[in-house]
Amino acid sequence: RIDLVLFVNGFAIITMELKCNTSGQNVQNAIEQYRTDRDSNSRLLKYKIGALVNFAMDLEEVYMCTKLNGKASYFLPFNQGNGEDGKGNPEPIDKTKLKVSYMWEDILTKDTLIYLIERFIFIEKSVKENKITGVKKVDETLIFPRYHQLNAVRRIVNDVKEYHTSKDYLIQHSAGSGKTNTIAWLSHICSDLHDDNNNNIFDTIIVMTDRIIVDRQLQDAILNLSHKSGVIKVLDDKCTAQDLKTAINGNTKIVVTTIQKFRYICDEIKNSSEKKFAVLIDEAHASTSGQNMLAVKKALNASAFSSALFVST
């Protein structure tokens, strides 16, 4: 039997296989147990029917998988990161605790589980075409955040609640570690943030890339999270700088655009006075210098009363 199952209102959300290093087993044995000993077609483990995520854990490390598929089951690390290479978990300051104490002290608590269900877990849809037959198929993947993604979003959101637009931030992700989804989660959560007086902290979230066209992966990630029409405006290669001007001057909550469009409208955005912006920059190392970035800052701070927060990735 599965070692541990967490339910919310009768629905299985998380399963866990637990191993004890001092007994000669570790997290890799837990992963192997999921791959070889567990029936992925059972009601509890069947993809999109059973539990949302499956954790393999020992006393030092945690791995996760959202789609069990026998020996092909792919597990990703769900660790806090440790040292320069970022692998594993740090030694706890409190020596009475384990390296994986964050799981039951944070991740498995009621508030965090509800937050994950409400704001993070989603179905990623992508269209794949058979190169031989030309038949297109919609592929669906259940996305559960890795620990570093959840941590980055929560830390910025909690700080923004206090400081609003008075600070800027930098998120560092290694290649292939899910930067695109981190941007998508952050843009949606920031668009709903309110202060103590129930006023919106931001009027508009601008997700910006320095590529000539909006990155398709970034575009799809943000659109996959939207449940309301009219909330997001993606300014792809068919849109002009004037479309960007209209979106910023209007009431669109999330605008996805290229940085180049700002150069043509920086002197024309007049209705943004008293507006508050959050600017999420994709590939910041290539974007935060030069005339394009100066145009962005000029456009969004055109008024003495408008303000912008910049989050670079």
Language-model features: where?
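A generic structural motif
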Residues: 44-51, 230-241, 309
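Conserved SAM-binding loop
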Residues: 145, 207, 312
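Residues immediately C-terminal
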Residues: 214, 261, 286-287, 312
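SF2 helicase catalytic motif II
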Residues: 272-306
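Conserved helicase motor
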Residues: 212, 234-243, 259-264
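ATP-dependent helicase/translocase motor core
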Residues: 1-204, 213, 217-229, 250-253, ...
